[in-house]
């Protein structure tokens, strides 16, 4: 199979939405029957985002094969059916790590290792390998043109453009076209300078996607075309919209997919965007609203919970309600108590690391349990629910996780001492182990208890979900917790590890050790999130009565 490559760059400012634009184009091409994948090349020196602060970088998206990746891969999976893997995201740090490892082994036969050709060759190899088996591979280059960190990646795709030829490569550049209120017009000069910068390193864009708060007038498109040496039909206006799921139709209406297909000489059907039209209709026509309190510790940056936010919205679509997320700092719960949890239709406690704010999450679980409020715990959200239950129901007053209190008399949650690395090797973990790459990661089979809410949600006796954690429920206390009324509704493939818990005599109190948000999509939703929002809606209706 001959793979075609679309390289996506960004200029003027960061956060223009390259990932959303790339994913939206991929969605249109997929709707035309093409097999599409998307890659993200990140210029930072970290080997992967696994140890980066969520408040700086946003969430870490985990792929099925256990790679810790950029949150943009979450966008990719929500827009197209192709599942991402570790070949879809790599960083400057990973490239340098692999090149230096080869140098230490002597693979380069004593050559002087340089950015060109050794680093650029390694990047090109990754890009070509990631595109294998697909009709089209869209490659997003992180950062902004002009950043020193991005230069090796830009040089690599420049070389690929020459080596593969125009019939297999296309360069798409996102820029900002701001509107100046004082002048009463949009300004194209930033775009002109951005394209000039890109051309100075040898890349001539074939398509310009112009971001702004409004559509670009035809005369300004003609001006951009003239000064940037791009066909006028290849100047695409991408205005702000109230839903990112409208963007595929917006790009389709301007013929971007036709331009790509013609450029690559591909024969394929017209795009069928009916599934996306249905998503947009559901989003615009809810029959009600629910308020979900998300009790977390990284709430100053909503992108830290990007997939959870989107999964809640998807569940709202399936239940025909709009979901309003109320972000609640878990430390605020510690300081003010239950008053900050009033007026909610459900509580969700997402994952997290470290002791800060954990008691606030435990209080949130207690409030939901005692007030029959729908509760959904994810990863740490399951662990705090179990700790709360152990303390206040099962008679273990000082129960805790050894992550937060190594001297607790009731360590109901403890460190996993054995794990499997990305190469499939069994490794031993201890307190001094590295933080990076030492977690239980990726898709794992989970057996579900017959008759449980989990089994009802999944409509079956098993599921496969993605994990990212290094602490588990301590089996020593399982029997005591079960006797107190806790249901262990999900177990690992070998039935040795607890994956899900529920509570008897509660409308909907469900928690999982895994991260179901990573597999939720706007077209398909996710059964656990759907069940949670359905329970929140039912709780609201009971309150109204």
From Swiss-Prot:
InterPro entries, per database record: Class_I_gatase-like (IPR029062), CTP_synthase (IPR004468), CTP_synthase_N (IPR017456), GATASE (IPR017926), GATase1_CTP_Synthase (IPR033828), P-loop_NTPase (IPR027417)
Task: Tell whether Methyltransferase is among the UniProt keywords.
Answer: no
Q: Does the keyword Magnesium apply?
A: yes
Active site annotation, chain numbering = 379, 515, 517
Q: Which GO terms describe its cellular component?
A: cytosol
Binding residues for ATP: 15-20, 72, 239-241
Protein residues bound to CTP: 14, 147-149, 187-192, 223
Q: Name one GO molecular function term.
A: glutaminase activity
Supply any other comment: CTPSs have evolved a hybrid strategy for distinguishing between UTP and CTP. The overlapping regions of the product feedback inhibitory and substrate sites recognize a common feature in both compounds, the triphosphate moiety. To differentiate isosteric substrate and product pyrimidine rings, an additional pocket far from the expected kinase/ligase catalytic site, specifically recognizes the cytosine and ribose portions of the product inhibitor.
Q: Which family does it belong to?
A: Belongs to the CTP synthase family.
Q: What is this protein called?
A: CTP synthase
Q: Which organism is it from?
A: Shewanella baltica (strain OS155 / ATCC BAA-1091)
Show the taxonomic lineage. Bacteria, Pseudomonadati, Pseudomonadota, Gammaproteobacteria, Alteromonadales
- In the UniProt record, the gene name given for this protein reads pyrG
């Amino acid at each position: 199979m001959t793979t075609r490559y679309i390289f996506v760059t960004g200029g003027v400012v960061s956060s223009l939405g390259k990932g959303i634009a790339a994913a939206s184009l991929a969605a249109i091409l997929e709707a035309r029957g093409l097999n599409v994948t998307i890659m993200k090349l990140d210029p930072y020196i970290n080997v992967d985002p696994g140890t980066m602060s969520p408040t700086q970088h946003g969430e870490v998206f985990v792929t099925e094969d256990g790679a810790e990746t950029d949150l943009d891969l979450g966008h990719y999976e929500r827009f197209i059916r192709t599942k991402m893997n570790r070949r879809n995201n790599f960083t400057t740090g990973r490239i340098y790590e692999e090149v230096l490892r080869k140098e230490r082994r002597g693979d380069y036969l004593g050559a002087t290792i340089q950015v060109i050709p050794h680093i650029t060759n390694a990047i090109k190899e990754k890009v070509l390998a990631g595109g294998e088996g697909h009709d089209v591979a869209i490659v997003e280059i992180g950062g902004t043109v002009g950043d020193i960190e991005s230069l090796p990646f830009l040089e690599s795709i420049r070389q690929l453009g020459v080596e593969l030829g125009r019939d297999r490569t296309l360069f798409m550049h996102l820029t900002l076209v701001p509107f100046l209120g004082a002048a009463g017009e949009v300004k194209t000069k930033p775009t002109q300078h951005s394209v000039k910068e890109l051309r100075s390193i040898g890349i001539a864009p074939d398509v310009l996607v112009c971001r702004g708060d409004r559509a670009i007038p035809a005369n300004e498109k003609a001006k951009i075309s003239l000064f940037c040496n791009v066909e006028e039909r290849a100047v695409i206006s991408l205005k702000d919209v109230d839903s990112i799921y409208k963007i595929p139709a917006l790009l389709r209406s301007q013929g971007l997919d036709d331009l790509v297909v013609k450029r690559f000489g591909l024969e394929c059907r017209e795009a069928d965007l009916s599934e996306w039209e249905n998503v947009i209709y559901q989003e615009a026509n809810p029959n009600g609203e629910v308020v979900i309190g998300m009790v977390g510790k990284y709430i100053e940056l909503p992108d830290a919970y990007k997939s959870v936010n989107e999964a809640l919205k998807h569940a709202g679509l399936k239940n025909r309600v709009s979901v309003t997320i109320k972000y609640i700092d878990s430390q605020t719960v510690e300081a003010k108590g239950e008053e900050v949890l009033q007026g909610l239709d459900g509580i969700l406690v997402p994952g997290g690391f470290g002791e800060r704010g954990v008691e606030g999450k435990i209080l949130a679980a207690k409030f939901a349990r005692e007030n029959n409020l729908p509760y959904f715990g994810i990863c740490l959200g399951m662990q705090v629910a179990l700790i709360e239950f152990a303390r206040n129901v099962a008679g273990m007053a000082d129960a805790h996780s050894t992550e937060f209190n190594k001297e607790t008399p009731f360590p109901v949650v403890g460190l996993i001492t054995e794990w499997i690395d990305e190469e499939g090797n069994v490794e031993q973990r201890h307190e001094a182990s590295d933080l990076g790459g030492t977690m239980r990661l990726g898709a794992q089979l989970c057996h579900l208890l017959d008759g449980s809410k989990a089994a009802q949600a999944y409509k079956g006796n098993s599921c496969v979900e993605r994990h990212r954690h290094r602490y588990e429920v301590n089996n020593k206390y399982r029997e005591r917790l079960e006797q107190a009324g806790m249901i262990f509704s999900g177990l690992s493939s070998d039935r040795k590890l607890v994956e899900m818990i529920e509570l008897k005599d509660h409308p909907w109190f469900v928690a999982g050790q895994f991260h179901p948000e990573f597999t939720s999509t706007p077209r398909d939703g996710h059964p656990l999130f759907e069940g949670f929002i359905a329970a929140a809606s039912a709780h609201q209706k009971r309150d109204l009565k």
